Structure formats: C-alpha cells, structure tokens
Amino acid sequence: MKIIVDMMGGDNAPRAVLEGAAQAVKEYGVTVIGVGDEALVRRTAQENNISLEGMELVNCTQVIDMCDEPARAIRTKKDSSIVVGLNLLKEGKGDAFVSAGSTGALHVGASLIVRTLRGVKRPALATMVPAKQQAYLLLDCGANVECRPEKLAAFAVMGSCYVNRVEGRPSPSVALANNGAEESKGTPMLKEAHQLLKTTPGIRFVGNIEPRDVPNGEVDVVVCDGFTGNVILKLTEGVAKMLLGMLKQMFLANLGGKIAYLLLKGGVKDLKHQMDSEEYGGAPFLGAKQPVIKAHGSSEAKGIKNAIRQAKICVENDLCGTMQSALDELAAAQKTEE
C-alpha cells in the first residue's frame, strides 16, 4: 500500500513528518511517497539520522502557506506539495493522502482535484474527539459553516460508516448537536434536520445532544454544521488544556501536592494519554472519492505516524466505497419520499 505524504505541511515539517513517516513504514509496512523539496527532505533526514528506506520522494518547488487564500493557492501553486500530492492520488499513484498543511487548501483540493462522492458537494471535515467514556466523531468541525438538513443527513451517514469501518464499532449511535434534547428545540433548520435524521436509512439516530453532554462520550457520532463543530472542538481543546494546567499547578504548589502526584502519577499519565489528540491520527475529509487525512498543524512524529495508520485503515476497509453505497441508499430513500 502506498500512502502519499506532504513533507512540507505543518509547523514541524519536514523533520516531524519524516520521523512519523519512517515510523509508519517500519510499524505498518506501508510505502510512503513523500512530496516536497527533495533536497531539503534528504538533508533533514541525514541531519536527524532518519532512514528513507521504504520511501519514494517526489520533488516539488512550492509550498502553500497557512496565510494563503485556499482556492487561489490551489489554482496558482500547481507545484506545491499539496497540489502535487492530491494529483498523484487522483492519478492512482497512491492509495491515500496525508498532510498537516493548510486545512482550507486541503478542503478545496479534495473537492476540485480528488473530487467528491455522488451526493456530496463538499467533503465534511471530521475528527475523533477525546471524551469521558470513549472518543466520538465530530462532523463537520469547520469545513462547511452553513448546512441544510439534507447535508447533515449525509454527514450522519458518512460519519456512521467511518466509526463502523475505521474505529470498529458496530451500529454506532448518531446524535444531532442542539441546545436541548427535546425534538422541539433548536432553529427551524435543526428541527427539520431532526425529523430527517429520524428516517435516514443506515444510521442509528438517538436524537439531539446538548453541548454539556457531548464530552461524556455517550454517543459515537455528533453531527452539526461546521461553525458549531469548530466551536465545540476548540472549546474542548481549551478546557482540556486548562484542566491539565491546573492539575500541574496544584501538584507543584507544595510538598503535599508533590506527594499526591507521586501517588497518582499512573492515573495522570493515563489521563494525558486519553486526552492526546495525536493518538487518534488526523481529521478525514469525508466525502472525497479517496482518503484525504488532515493531520494537526502542530503534529510531531506520533501524530503523523497515526494519521498514516488511519489512512491505511481507511483503504483496507474500503471506506470510500462503503460511504458511496450508503449515500446511494440515502439518495434513493429521499427520492422515494418525494
């Protein structure tokens, strides 16, 4: 299996990307096609004693920066690592694409270069979010700011397929993010979406979920528009960072705190592991014809390695094919209702 990796994307590229790719080659047996400034990549590998075994390098001369306007960058920076990598994926030179680069550029590129599945106009950005009981899939978390009920139904179908095929959870539960659990709550659009989700085939819809209940991890998939999802995601990240910081401050405050830390060290380590987003890989653009994974911009080697693992699982389980079948079933059901 060949996974195309953007060597120039992210705050710590190319060093962290190279390290993560090398670990993935060794642990998962994949071939990595690294796209980027080949001279810089080889020099970085040599300076950091990183093996290039199992990697094929494709040279490119441009990089899409975080400050670049996404659509314009995709059109004008034809020799950038993102555009070259996505074109390689489209041409069948690899099985999936992983990048820690610009989210906006990846979203535009996934739509215009890789193209989308039938029934999908723009892919949804989805991510596994750490929670109390178990991590849940949140979508959309930033790519589609405004969504009609029909789009939310498609998100629910794709999210359910992802959690089932990639996370291995049978019959995953799906909830709609809202300001109340009752059917009567929410905007007219959310009320309409609730009714549509109740009759959407192929999903186990359990109703609305309030933001205060989302972190409990009692459902497998939380569906919402990209604006709401981005707020949920960033608030969750902020609260987690604050709580871990407060714990550290408490343990270091005095001798009693330091003794308490020694007694609770194992539990604290487990908590940090559970809350570490890098453990879950990246955020897939669900609805693209082939797997496109967005790793966190600040990813170190572990995050890149796990994003490659995630891409491998998507390919092995034919995620895109499964989603297309489910979307076709949804379209047929909606046509029958008309």
Sequence positions of predicted segments:
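Phosphate/nucleotide-donor binding subsite
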Residues: 50-94
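Glycine-rich phosphate/diphosphate-binding loop of Rossmann-like nucleotide-binding domains
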Residues: 15-16, 31-33, 39, 145-207, ...
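Glycine-rich phosphate/nucleotide-binding loop
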Residues: 111-124, 128-138, 218-222, 226-336
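Short glycine/serine/threonine-rich phosphate/pyrophosphate-binding segments
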Residues: 13-17, 79-92, 96-110, 117, ...
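Short helix-capping segments at alpha-helix termini
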Residues: 25-28, 46-54, 167, 197-203
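N-terminal phosphate-binding or glycine-rich loops at protein starts, especially the Walker A/P-loop
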Residues: 1-42
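Short, glycine-rich nucleotide/cofactor-binding loops
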Residues: 5-15, 143-153, 294-300
